[in-house]
From Swiss-Prot:
Residues 39-42, 163-167, 243-248 are annotated as: Interaction with substrate tRNA. Its cofactor is Mg(2+). This is tRNA dimethylallyltransferase. Pfam families: IPPT (PF01715). HAMAP family: IPP_trans. NCBIfam families: miaA. It catalyses: adenosine(37) in tRNA + dimethylallyl diphosphate = N(6)-dimethylallyladenosine(37) in tRNA + diphosphate. The lineage of its organism: Bacteria, Pseudomonadati, Pseudomonadota, Gammaproteobacteria, Candidatus Pseudothioglobaceae.
Length: 305
C-alpha cells in the first residue's frame, strides 16, 4: 500500500523498550521517510550501549537524524531540539519524504506541538555559577530557594530534578522574571497536521524487556563505555548526560558508592520508573492510534486515513 505524504508529521511514541525504532525502520524499508530521533539520551556521542542506540550499520542504512549531535558535556535544550527537528521536517517535505519523529522524550514532543516560551539563553558564566551552587548546596536546598522565588515552578519540578531546578533559578537570575511568568505565551513549532502513533505493550512485557536489555548491555561492554566517559575531566554526575538511567548508577558504582549487584538492581528499577513516567504521559495524549505490537500495515492504514 502506498503512503500519503500530504505534509503530515508522524509522531511515533512509546515507552522505553516498546519497539519504536524497529517499527520506524520497517516503515523506512517500504517508504520514503526521514527518521528524526526524539530522545534526549541519543543526542550524545560516545553513549551508545547504555542508550540502546541503533548500531552504526543500521544508522548508515537507515539514517536517524538528531542522533550523535552533542558531546556529553554539551548543553542541549528543548529549544535546541525544536529548532533542529523543525529544520529536519522542512527538509523532509522538500525531499517528498514522510517525517517520522520517533522516541520517548515527552518534553521534546510537547515542545514541537505546543511551543516553548522565549527564555534567556544560558551563558558559560551562569552555567558555571549554578553548577557550583548545585555542588555546594544540593538539589533539595536549591529547590527550597526556588520555592521562595517561584512557588508555581517549584510545585511542578521534582526536588531531585537538578537540571530543571537550576535552569529555573538561572532564568530568574538572568532576566529578573520567574520561569512561570515567562512561560505564559507559547506558539506551536509545527504548522502541519500531526498524526500520533503510540506503541504500548503490556507493562509486564516492558518490565521483562527492560531487565533483559540491561543485562545484555552489561554483557556487551556497558561498563567499559562508562569507564571511557569517566576519563573525560569535563564530565560529572550532575550533568544531564550522566544522569541518564543506567549511566548514573554505573557512575556511582565506578566511584565506589554502590556495589555491582546494587548498581544493576538500581539501574533496572530506574528504567522501570522512567517507563512508568512515559506511560503516564502517553495515557494523557489525545487523538492517538495505539498499538500493542508493531504493525507496519496498521500504521500505514492509519496514516492514510
Amino acid at each position: 500500500m502506498p503512503i500519503k505524504i500530504n505534509k503530515t508529521v508522524i509522531f511515533l511514541m512509546g515507552p522505553t523498550t516498546s519497539g519504536k525504532t524497529d517499527l520506524a525502520i520497517k516503515l523506512s524499508q517500504q517508504f520514503k521517510t526521514r527518521l528524526i530521533s526524539v530522545d534526549s539520551a541519543l543526542i550524545y556521542k560516545g553513549m551508545d550501549i547504555g542508550t540502546a542506540k541503533p548500531d552504526k550499520a543500521t544508522l548508515k542504512k537507515y539514517p536517524h537524524h538528531l542522533i550523535d549531535i552533542c558531546n556529553p558535556e554539551d548543553s542541549y535544550s528543548a529549544f535546541n531540539f525544536a529548532r533542529n527537528a523543525n529544520a529536519q521536517i522542512k527538509t523532509a517535505f522538500a525531499n517528498n519524504e514522510l517525517p517520522i519523529l520517533v522516541g520517548g522524550t515527552s518534553f521534546y514532543f510537547h515542545a514541537l506541538e505546543y511551543g516553548l516560551s522565549k527564555l534567556p539563553e544560558s551563558t558559560p558564566e551562569s552555567k558555571e555559577k549554578f553548577n557550583q551552587l548545585l555542588k555546594s548546596k544540593g538539589t533539595i536546598k536549591l529547590h527550597r530557594d526556588l520555592k521562595r522565588i517561584d512557588l508555581q515552578a517549584a510545585n511542578r519540578i521534582h526536588p531531585n530534578d537538578a537540571q530543571r531546578i537550576t535552569r529555573a533559578l538561572e532564568v530568574f537570575d538572568l532576566s529578573g522574571k520567574t520561569l512561570s511568568k515567562l512561560q505564559g505565551n507559547k506558539k506551536p513549532i509545527i504548522n502541519h497536521p500531526i498524526k500520533k502513533i503510540i506503541l504500548m505493550p503490556e507493562r509486564s512485557e516492558l518490565h521483562q524487556r527492560i531487565e533483559e536489555r540491561f543485562l545484555s548491555m552489561m554483557e556487551h561492554g556497558f561498563l567499559d563505555e562508562v569507564k571511557h566517559l569517566k576519563q573525560n575531566p569535563n564530565l560529572h554526575e550532575n550533568l544531564p548526560a550522566i544522569r541518564c538511567v543506567g549511566y548514573r548508577q554505573a557512575w556511582q558504582y565506578l566511584n565506589g558508592k554502590i556495589d555491582k549487584a546494587e548498581m544493576i538492581e538500581k539501574a533496572i528499577i530506574a528504567t522501570r520508573k522512567l517507563c512508568k513516567r512515559q506511560n503516564t504521559w502517553l495515557k494523557s495524549e489525545k487523538y492517538v492510534f495505539i498499538l500493542k505490537s508493531p504493525s507496519p500495515v496498521k500504521v500505514v492504514t492509519f496514516i492514510n486515513s
